[in-house]
Amino acid sequence: MATIPIRLQALATDQTVLKLPHPYKTEFAVRKASKASTKLPVYNLVPKPFPTRPLPFELHNDHLVFTDAIHLKSSELPPDSNNGAWARARRAPCVTLYWDGVEVPTLKQAWLVVYAFFTMRPGMDSFRLELDGNSAANLARQIKDVLLGIDHPIKARQQQEPCAKTKENTLLILRSTFWQGAGCPFGPRPVWCPQESPSSLLPSTCLSSFPLAPFHRTSTISLAGDPEDFDRCQQSWHPIRPAKPAPGSIIYSRWIPYLGEMFSMVALDPEDSEHVRLFHEWQSDPRVLQGWTETKTLDQHRRYLEALHKDPHQLTVLAKWDDSPFAYFELYWAKENRLGGYIDAGDFDRGRHSFVGDVRFRGPLRVSAWWSSLMHYLFLDDPRTMHIVGEPRDTHSTVLMYDFIHGFGLDRFIDLPSKRSAFMRCSRDRFFQSFPLEDSEKVIGGTSIRVVQKL
């Protein structure tokens, strides 16, 4: 496991600390720099000399240097009994950005430094950022305007004083807004969700170049899946869903630092023989059959995938580690899904089913990475998605434990026609607050309660 040292001075000069998602995949390392006006060690982000797709703008800035994330001395910290906004900010570590000359770093370049720190320090829910250089106040306003950061909170008693204000060049950078795409310089979609076109549009015309899918409702009648009454149907009233990404396109990617590999999700193409072959072979594995019971011929599996492709409420996905496919996901809008007939689903709530097909990529470290990344995608794909839901079998303890680890709560048990299920739900607030994207201890939803189930 590729663990990044806590302190920047311990990093090897060629160690990758950050790798941009698809399609760029540019790698960055941290190098020691110098700054005459400070005695603190300072560093610079430098791109590694590997062939990648050229960036559309300059992210690297030789003149922008930064300190490590430094905590205040214990004597300077507020007491533990003070949990106000100012006190919480003071407990957060501080990073200082320096630059010389009249050229001011761009918001894009500041975003890259923030990305590096939240990748190297995933446990930080915020950090203080001090800007030191020409026109620092203007860069600070830009960071606040895109909600990558906020003003450093003022001490409660000072708020009552008319002249009270914080240093305008000191900000509080927020992990929760960063991972939702705040300040991302690659267009209207967060960098982890490439701007791919649906198959009907030209490759140069991405769906995100249009306004967010308008809200308009329709009704759907579908089979209820009752094994005793195959003709029983259920009706749902739900928003019309946006167009699906083009089959074969990458819909999400993120470099996993503790594995040193790129996780990605590809929209499955039912006309791609390799995609169908993988699905068929994986579904023929007795281990997979225990949960999915989809014993079918190759042609039947092809028709199964074609039917899902035509269903506007479901999206089929192949997941990869680097270039190796390893898992299959079915993503759905909950309102018109079978589950929607048993819960009060929100208009944009989503759910997922999944299995790992390639046994080489099993194990808790990898599961934690793709489980959280899949959730991350569902929240990023449509900012109106407020909850992710699930309905694993109530006896499936491993799935339940992974859900608990990644921020889900057990709402109640529901009796579907084919099984008794645990209705699991995770809110957007919970996900981005507890932040399960790191390789953390196996505890329940960001608490200190350890998982006892063997994973």
Swiss-Prot record:
Putative O-acetyltransferase; part of the satratoxin SC2 cluster involved in the biosynthesis of satratoxins, trichothecene mycotoxins that are associated with human food poisonings. Satratoxins are suggested to be made by products of multiple gene clusters (SC1, SC2 and SC3) that encode 21 proteins in all, including polyketide synthases, acetyltransferases, and other enzymes expected to modify the trichothecene skeleton. SC1 encodes 10 proteins, SAT1 to SAT10. GO terms for molecular function: N-acyltransferase activity. The gene is SAT14. Pathway: Mycotoxin biosynthesis. Gene3D superfamilies: 3.40.630.30. Keywords: Acyltransferase, Transferase. The keyword Phosphoprotein does not apply. Trichothecenes are sesquiterpenoid toxins that act by inhibiting protein biosynthesis. PANTHER family: ACYLTRANSFERASE MBTK_IUCB-LIKE CONSERVED DOMAIN-CONTAINING PROTEIN, LYSINE N-ACYLTRANSFERASE C17G9.06C-RELATED. Belongs to the lysine N-acyltransferase MbtK family. The keyword Hydrolase does not apply. This is Putative O-acetyltransferase SAT14. InterPro entries: Acyl_CoA_acyltransferase (IPR016181), Acyltransferase_MbtK/IucB-like (IPR019432). One of its GO terms (biological process) is siderophore biosynthetic process. Transmembrane segments: none annotated. Its EC number is 2.3.1.-.
